Amino acid sequence: MAFRHIVVAGGGVLGAQIAFQTAFKGFDVTIWLRSEGSIGRTEPKLERLYNVYRAEIARVEAALRAGEPLELPRGFGAADSVKSEADIQRLYEAVERAKKNLELSLDLEQCAEEADFIIESMAE
């Protein structure tokens, strides 16, 4: 079975990070939350992660242009996977896809039905 749709139960600091990184790697991701208030707390975390990822890509892009050694964040891939502006563009596209492919939901039943894999990241 090929996993395509991942559900992360919980959108706190850890859940948001798991969800964004999973979406960055190309999966469709839904974050299941318990309340409207949780949505309001999760959205800024996701926006922050989006901005952090873009800033990291910009840093790598500047190093590439300057001919400096490249140090990619671990979740971005191996340093030798970025050799050109086209590779940088692919990273930017992955961040945009991640943002687009993240969904927030309050409907646990629907999330469970659609999920190929569920990751639990809820407060105890």
Question: How does the language model describe each region?
Answer:
Residues M1-R4, E109:
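A short, basic/flexible loop-to-alpha-helix module at the beginning of a structural domain
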Residues G11-G12:
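Glycine-rich Rossmann-fold phosphate-binding loop(s) that bind the pyrophosphate
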Residues G15-A16:
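N-terminal Rossmann-fold NAD(P) dinucleotide-binding loop
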Residues V29:
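Short beta-strand element of Class I
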Residues R34-R41, V52-E124:
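Rossmann-like NAD(P)-binding element
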Residues T22:
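Aromatic pocket-lining residues of Rossmann-like dinucleotide-binding sites
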Residues V7-V8:
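Hydrophobic Val/Ile/Leu positions in short beta-strands of Rossmann-like dinucleotide-binding domains
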